[in-house]
Amino acid sequence: MAVSPKINRREHILQCLATMLETNPGQRITTAKLAAEVGVSEAALYRHFPSKARMFEGLIDFIEESLLSRINLIMTEEKDTMKRCQLLLQLLLIFSERNPGISRVLNGDALLGENERLRSRVSLIFSKIETHLKQILREKTLREGKGFNLDEAILANLLLAIAEGRIAQFVRSEFKQKPTEHFDQQWIFIQQQLLQS
């Protein structure tokens, strides 16, 4: 597969890695298979990335930058607590649905047998998302003078667990059960429960 000189080789390698994660669910990706997919030698891969772990770090960097930059936009543009929570969870679910291979990284499935540092990086991304959810829920008390009957940290953890569960179902179903399926109806129920608390 010839790559146009205009395409950044590093980006092309990462795109191929994400595609392979999508098209080979449950399988481990070797550098030999990746090199064949990219159309270069393994040595050429290592000219752009010193290790396979660095390739996964490149995907994790993309995940973090994509999600957190959009979360910051939600935080800036939307002031309603429930709408912020909904948009943040939808962002995570839509991002996963549009990037099935990357969902395997988020879920940890693609990182089995890889460097522990990679799983820690993904955990850190989820911790940052949970922190944003806590902040959103705590700001409701400050803005409206009325909070929730349950600690905001517990609620934030529950909301994130719902999204993570949907991503896990998506990966487990080999990308057939979409993370966004029924989310709108589920959110109505979740919101009612949150507002009653």
UniProtKB/Swiss-Prot annotation:
Write down the SUPFAM superfamilies for this protein, in alphabetical order.
Homeodomain-like (SSF46689)
Q: What does UniProt give as GO cellular component?
A: bacterial nucleoid; cytoplasm
- The residues that make up the annotated DNA-binding region are 30-49
Annotated GO MF terms: sequence-specific DNA binding
Q: Keywords in alphabetical order, please.
A: Cell cycle, Cell division, Cytoplasm, DNA-binding
Q: Which residues form the HTH tetR-type domain?
A: 7-67
Q: Where in the cell is it found?
A: Cytoplasm, Nucleoid
Keyword Cytoplasm among UniProt keywords: yes
Principal cellular location given in the protein's record: cytoplasm
- Classification via Pfam families: SlmA-like_C, TetR_N
Give the matching InterPro entries. Answer: Homeodomain-like_sf (IPR009057), HTH-type_Tx_Regulator (IPR050624), HTH_TetR (IPR001647), NO_SlmA (IPR023769), SlmA-like_C (IPR054580)
**Protein family per UniProt:** Belongs to the nucleoid occlusion factor SlmA family.
Assembly notes: Homodimer. Interacts with FtsZ.
Role of this protein = Required for nucleoid occlusion (NO) phenomenon, which prevents Z-ring formation and cell division over the nucleoid. Acts as a DNA-associated cell division inhibitor that binds simultaneously chromosomal DNA and FtsZ, and disrupts the assembly of FtsZ polymers. SlmA-DNA-binding sequences (SBS) are dispersed on non-Ter regions of the chromosome, preventing FtsZ polymerization at these regions.
Q: What is this protein called?
A: Nucleoid occlusion factor SlmA
Natural source organism: Shewanella sediminis (strain HAW-EB3)
